[in-house]
Amino acid sequence: MSDIRHVWIRLPILGCYVFLIGLMPVAQTTGQAEPGEHDGNVVTEWNAIAQNAIVTVGAQPIQRSQLWMTLVHVAIYDAVTSIDGQYEQFKVTPAHLRPASRDAAAIAAAHGILVSLLPSQQASLDAARENSLSAIRDGARKNNGIAIGEEVASRLLEIHDGVIPTVAYTPGLGPGVWQPTPPAFANALLPGFAQVTPFALASASQFRPGPPPALSSSMWTRDFDEVKSFGVATGSLRTPEQTEIGRFYTEHAVAQYSRAFRRYAIENGLDVQKTARFFAMANTAILDSQIACWDAKFHYNFWRPVTAIRAGDTDGNPATAPDAGWIGLAITPPHPEYPAAHGCWTSATARILELFNGTNVVHFALDSAVTGTTHVFETVDDLRAEIINARVYGGMHFRNSVEVGATIGEHVADWVAFGFRARRGQNEEEDRRRR
């Protein structure tokens, strides 16, 4: 697998931009299977149960799925860490019941969140709970663990109810303004997601970026021409490898990344405490990055490539030639373009991997149900670089928008990680720095 870097050269003779493509190895494509769920622990087990309930059976959109998945894993984390005592609770500190089973607490916490959010699935979720709890010996430890998990779930839902506000939104008109995109021309997706209270950030606008490039700028011309040439469905300048990258990340992101997180936890032998912390950090960083991204998207309301390229003669820039029939490789999601949500999402993931491990050198595998392939990344920089290219190859985004999204994701992850720190006094240097 390779990362494709584009170098732009102005050729006066041709009067157009030509791309010189250099190759930098970043990932391998393999056919390796995901480790079996029995190889993990109760956290990976209930992540898979949550994925099935929320995404597969519940058929929830990505943003609501991520909100609910974060509730599940913050509940698990607070329940487990209240027993272990090494880390501060993130949202809820339950009653001090001892002795207590971490596994029972995690199971009860996850179950409590899911049945509240998905009452129609109560029977199957209750059965999953009983099956998981059956592996734990009856007694005070089990009972106390269950009580802790149930308390955490109930109290967390009082803080974050998992509801996305309904907000009226009317698309604008004119150059640079988002409009519904083909083929479905669907209404904007969940504009109220920008008003969901973040789990860690002070506000959704905390890391709001500056505006997208002016339509008269050289950056706009560069990005317009790049996605027009590399992101088009047919007749593009993409290599087969680049086409695979463009399609790879078009799966439901919560399903795709949940599988990757389970694989990572299992392959690295993380115990229940470490798995709970990793899943809570990663999911919270992703969620808050998406809320921040939605805030910026619906603040700037920037148009998508498919709209911009079809109307290239309306932007006041003589260097952006229109193509009235242009359509991207992937279906454009129904929300404004700037910044790119997957840039925020994947960069937040990459930064959490780096902070969790204390190094940017990782072995992180993502598979795609769309392409049937697996990409293995040895550094977080490789993961971040590939998503920037992928959204351009898919025809959904301009390069600058993905880069800006990646910056947001990194900032959000740094902020989120502080909430999952060791108990006060174990990291006095960081405590002083943040005060």
Residue ranges and their predicted role:
Residues 1-2, 435:
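Accessible peptide chain termini
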Residues 30-431, 435:
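Acidic/polar surface patches and capping/hinge elements
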Residues 12-25:
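Bacterial N-terminal signal peptides
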Residues 3-15:
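Bacterial N-terminal signal peptides that target proteins for export
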Residues 3-5, 23, 428-430:
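Coiled-coil-like amphipathic alpha-helices with heptad-repeat character
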